[in-house]
C-alpha cells in the first residue's frame, strides 16, 4: 500500500492551510481551563446522536468506503464550513476487504460461527482441512515465538486467544512456525468483530475469529477442522476531513485528530464517534479565527479501522518542511467506554509496559492531560503507544504525541476499579467493534471528563507549545527529530 506517490503529495499540499485568510470568530479563552468548560457533554452527545442516525440510515455502520462514512464526512465538513473554516476532504485509496464465504466445521462436524479478519488471505472456495493445535493462553497469548515452544504446528490450524498484541503479530508468528491457518478466540462472550491484520501485505495465512465459548469448545475437543474463508481484497477510495484555524503560527502547528470511520459491524459511537464528536465540538467552540499563538489543524481520519490508512497517507504525503512545522499531534480515540478507564498516552514510558516512550515532548503532553484530570479528582493511568491508533504515523517520524483514552478490549484491573469504579477483570468496552457500540452504551461521565480534556489540551498548546510540559521548538526540534 505505498502506491500513492503523486496523489498523496498533492493531497498533503492541499492540507497546509494559509494563516492569512479572512474570517471573524470569537476569541478562544486564553485560560485553557475556562475553554474546557465550553465543550459540554450535551453538545458532544448531540453529535453522537447524529452519527448514530447516519449509521441507522446506512445499513447500521459508518465504515470506510460506504455511504455511511460519506454521510459522516459531510456532517463534519458542513458544520466546520458553517463556522468559517476552510475545509478539505482529500481522497486516498485503500484496500477494501470482502470476507466472502465464512465457514468452520469442528472435529465432530458441527458448524462453528467464524469471521474472517480483515485482509485475511483466502483458503479458496473448498477451504483447508487440518488438525487443530491450541496455544494455551498466557501473558502473551500467541504474541511471542516462545509461546509455540514444544508444539508442532506445521500445517496445522492454530488457535490462540485475543489480547496483548495486534492480530497481525499473532498471525505472523503462527505463519513463521508453519501454521496453515489461524483462529483467534475472543476474550469476551461475543464474536470477534472488526479485527484486522493491518494492511494487505501483512496477510500471510487465512485468519478467522471465533467467540470465547467457541474457542474453549474447540480447544477441549481437538481433531481435524475444516475452515473456509473465501476472501478477496480490492482497491477503493475514502476521504479525510481537514480544517485549520486561520490564525496562529503556521510553523508550530498543533494537529488534533480523531478517526471518523466505524467498523462494518456497528455504528461506532464510542469507537470512534466519541473522539470525533469531542474534537468537532472543540473546533466549533474555538472557531476558525481565534486569538491563539499557534495554528490548530483539526483532522478527521478515514479508514483507521483497516490499518490507520488515512492518517498514514497524510503523513506520507507531507514534505520535510511540512513535517517540521508540526509541533505535536493530539489523538483522541474512544472517550466514553462503558466500563471506563481514565488513561493518558504514556509519553515517558513510566509504566514500562510494551513499547518505549514517545518522541521527545510526549512526556510533557502526558503530564498536561494527567494534571488536568487530577484537577477534576481523577487519577489517570498511562496507556502504551501500542500502534493501534492514528498517533502511530506521527510518532514514527518523531512528532511528539499524546491524548486521552477510555479503554478498548483491555481488562480493568482491580486497582483501577477501586479508584474509578466499574467492573474489575472486565474489558473497558465490552461492546468494542460490535453492533452494541451505540449511544445507549456510552458512559456520559467519562465522556464529559475526556471531552473537557480534549478542549483543555488543544487550548493549552494553541497558546504555547513550550514550557515545562511543552515540546521542542526551533533548532531543538530539528535536533530531536534527527537523532
Describe each PLM feature range.
Residues 38-59, 66, 79-83, 143-145, ...:
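Catalytic-core environment of secreted peptidases
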Residues 66, 113-211, 267, 380:
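Extracellular/luminal Protease-associated
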Residues 291, 301-412:
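Metal-dependent peptidase/peptidase-like ectodomains
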Amino acid at each position: 500500500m505505498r502506491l500513492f506517490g503523486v496523489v498523496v503529495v498533492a493531497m498533503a499540499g492541499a492540507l497546509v492551510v494559509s494563516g492569512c485568510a479572512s474570517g471573524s470568530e470569537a476569541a478562544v479563552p486564553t485560560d485553557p481551563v475556562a475553554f474546557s468548560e465550553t465543550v459540554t457533554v450535551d453538545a458532544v452527545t448531540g453529535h453522537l446522536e447524529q452519527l448514530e442516525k447516519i449509521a441507522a440510515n446506512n445499513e447500521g455502520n459508518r465504515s470506510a468506503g460506504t455511504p455511511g462514512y460519506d454521510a459522516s464526512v459531510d456532517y463534519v465538513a458542513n458544520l466546520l464550513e458553517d463556522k468559517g473554516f476552510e475545509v478539505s476532504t482529500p481522497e486516498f485509496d485503500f484496500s477494501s476487504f470482502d470476507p466472502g464465504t465464512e465457514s468452520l466445521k469442528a472435529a465432530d462436524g458441527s458448524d462453528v460461527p467464524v469471521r474472517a479478519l480483515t485482509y485475511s488471505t483466502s483458503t479458496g472456495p473448498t477451504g483447508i482441512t487440518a488438525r487443530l493445535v491450541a496455544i494455551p493462553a498466557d501473558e502473551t497469548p500467541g504474541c511471542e515465538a516462545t509461546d509455540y515452544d514444544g508444539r508442532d504446528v506445521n500445517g496445522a490450524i492454530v488457535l490462540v486467544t485475543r489480547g496483548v498484541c495486534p492480530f497481525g503479530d499473532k498471525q505472523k508468528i503462527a505463519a513463521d512456525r508453519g501454521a496453515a491457518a489461524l483462529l483467534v478466540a475472543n476474550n469476551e462472550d461475543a464474536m470477534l468483530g472488526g479485527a484486522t491484520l493491518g494492511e494487505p501485505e501483512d496477510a500471510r495465512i487465512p485468519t478467522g475469529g471465533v467467540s470465547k465459548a467457541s474457542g474453549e469448545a474447540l480447544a477441549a475437543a481437538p481433531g481435524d477442522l475444516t475452515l473456509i474463508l473465501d476472501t478477496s481484497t480490492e482497491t477503493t477510495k475514502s476521504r479525510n476531513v481537514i480544517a485549520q484555524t486561520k490564525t496562529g503560527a503556521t510553523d508550530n502547528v498543533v494537529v488534533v485528530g480523531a478517526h471518523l470511520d466505524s467498523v462494518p459491524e456497528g455504528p461506532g459511537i464510542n469507537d470512534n464517534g466519541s473522539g470525533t464528536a469531542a474534537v468537532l465540538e472543540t473546533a466549533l467552540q474555538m472557531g476558525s479565527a481565534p486569538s491563539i499563538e499557534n495554528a490548530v489543524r483539526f483532522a478527521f481520519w478515514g479508514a483507521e479501522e483497516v490499518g490507520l490508512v488515512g492518517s498514514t497517507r497524510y503523513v506520507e504525503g507531507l514534505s520535510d518542511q511540512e513535517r517540521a512545522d508540526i509541533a505535536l499531534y493530539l489523538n483522541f480515540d474512544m472517550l466514553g467506554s462503558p466500563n471506563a478507564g481514565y488513561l493518558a498516552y504514556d509519553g515517558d514510558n513510566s509504566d514500562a509496559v510494551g513499547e518505549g516512550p514517545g518522541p521527545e515532548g510526549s512526556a510533557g503532553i502526558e503530564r498536561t492531560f494527567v494534571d488536568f484530570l487530577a484537577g477534576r479528582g481523577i487519577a489517570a493511568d498511562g496507556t502504551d503507544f501500542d500502534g493501534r491508533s492514528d498517533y502511530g504515523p506521527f510518532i514514527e517520524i518523531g512528532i511528539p504525541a499524546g491524548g486521552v483514552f477510555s479503554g478498548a478490549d483491555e481488562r480493568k484491573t482491580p486497582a483501577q476499579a477501586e479508584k474509578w469504579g466499574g467492573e474489575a477483570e472486565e474489558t473497558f468496552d465490552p461492546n468494542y467493534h460490535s453492533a452494541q457500540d451505540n449511544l445507549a452504551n456510552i458512559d456520559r461521565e467519562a465522556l464529559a471528563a475526556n471531552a473537557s480534556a480534549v478542549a483543555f489540551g488543544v487550548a493549552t498548546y494553541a497558546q504555547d507549545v513550550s514550557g515545562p510540559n511543552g515540546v521542542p521548538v526551533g533548532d531543538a526540534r530539528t535536533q530531536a527529530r534527527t537523532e
